[in-house]
UniProtKB/Swiss-Prot annotation:
Official protein name in the record: Membrane protein insertase YidC
Domain of life (superkingdom): Bacteria
Topology term for the membrane: Multi-pass membrane protein
Stated family: Belongs to the OXA1/ALB3/YidC family. Type 1 subfamily.
Keyword Protein transport: yes
Transmembrane regions listed in the UniProt entry: 7-27, 340-360, 415-435, 453-473, 494-514
Principal location class: membrane
Biological processes per GO annotation: protein insertion into membrane; protein transport
Keywords, comma-separated and alphabetical: Cell inner membrane, Cell membrane, Chaperone, Membrane, Protein transport, Transmembrane, Transmembrane helix, Transport
Function, in words: Required for the insertion and/or proper folding and/or complex formation of integral membrane proteins into the membrane. Involved in integration of membrane proteins that insert both dependently and independently of the Sec translocase complex, as well as at least some lipoproteins. Aids folding of multispanning membrane proteins.
Organism (species): Edwardsiella ictaluri (strain 93-146)
GO CC term (a single one): plasma membrane
Amino acid sequence: MDSQRNLFLVALLFVSFLIWQAWQTDHNPQPVAQTAGQSISDTASQAVPESGQGKLITVKTDVLALTINTRGGDIEQADLLAYPATLGSDTPFQLLETTPQFVYQAQSGLTGKSGPDNPANGARPLYSANQTSYEMLPGQDELRIPLTYTAANGVIYTKTFVLKRNDYAIAVDYKVKNDSHDALDLTLFGQLKQSVDLPKHRDTGSNNFALHTFRGAAYSSSDDKYQKYSFSDIEDKNLNVQTKGGWVAMLQQYFATAWIPHDSGVNTFYSANLGNGQAAIGYKAPSVSVAPNTEKVLSTTLWVGPELQSDMAAVAPHLDLTVDYGWLWFISQPLFKLLQLIHSFVGNWGFAIIIITFIVRGIMYPLTKAQYTSMAKMRMLQPKLQAMRERIGDDKQRMSQEMMALYKTEKVNPLGGCFPLLIQMPIFLALYYMLMGSVELRQAPFALWIHDLAAPDPFYILPILMGVTMFFIQKMSPTTVTDPMQQKIMTFMPVIFTVFFLWFPSGLVLYYIVSNLVTIIQQQLIYRGLEKRGLHSRDKK
């Protein structure tokens, strides 16, 4: 089997997979929503109403800039100060947003029969704060933002946001002081709501099949470590899952928001189609009773920031799975850890990709050698196979039987040239997932004109260089292709590859270029060995 045809087949499979994945992202099958005691309609009815008019409080740490609305105490805006919105910009990336064009908020509160956020009890609570602006000062490791609301029955609710230095996890504590004469029935909830349609200023790649990633909701439960729940799933059927522990989240490329319950009891995960083009996912903790003249503290945690795997894993089990490495996560995760290790020494993600390419190709050298040896043996059999075809004619069954007998006699595996390429395919895909999912590689520069390894080459130089390396491999490789149509396809294969890779991340194209250069070197070494065994001749191209 000819090596160029194998490469072309693998490339077509890869691109077809990416196109299928881009379609599947928006049309994926709906997960089965688990049901228990409470009906889905009851769960959806707990979706929080609009916050309405309230004062805006600004909060700033070394990594976050937040805007909190005193009506309900929701976080309506979150800027990630360490992550520019675009390459070279001084404007930080805005994760949470509340504008006429787009809404993405992190909401929390207390529902239940006595809850101030229960729609049946009127408008959401209007909290008061001692300041309108809070900022973490140098040398300060923790910033607390207390909001206070006193209900008509005398109950005092204090909602406190606790932020720490260099941390994207925000603790949200509710202190309930029941100075009334009646017991309170309260349920803590956390909810994330978002506009389904992206405005232009937030759409960074949905039209590029090679850069298309998942955007939507997700959750982790005792039954499912990680389950995506797309906006179309929310539109079709509201989620209703009863579970201990876990988390609910809204995801997009590189960034996530997530509510992590603290209660050890059974939490209810729900989703809701809110209308006005908005969808929500959230959780409700078990009901809590607060006796008269007593106090109780209810707590939860919000993650709002980049998908940093080690940090997220420390906040909640399986939260690091929100880094979308796809079905090859078991390859992508160790690849990324190795890449991180290399980067810690070389200080450049591009050079780290080059080094990891040499490592991967070095490990796979025995398979590569077996591939070329198998193809060389197949070429040596071509005269016998041609004579067999002339002798047998159109009897396909007899031809197949005698071919298998010949392969067995000559100890040749006809698939031996294809198998190593199929082994390389998952590694190539895993690297693609790693580049598209790892926020560490977002806007990571390499050298010269490459300022973002996760974005396509703006000048298309790397794809062209990749096509040139493929051309050299093609010219240096012996071929058994005699069909004129196949010969034309093989001739244009470097051009086809170049066009495919115009839209691919620069880091992936860099990997492929280096891999091709390694192939050229390994090819020459292997061919010299095959010449000594009489299995290859440089005169036969």
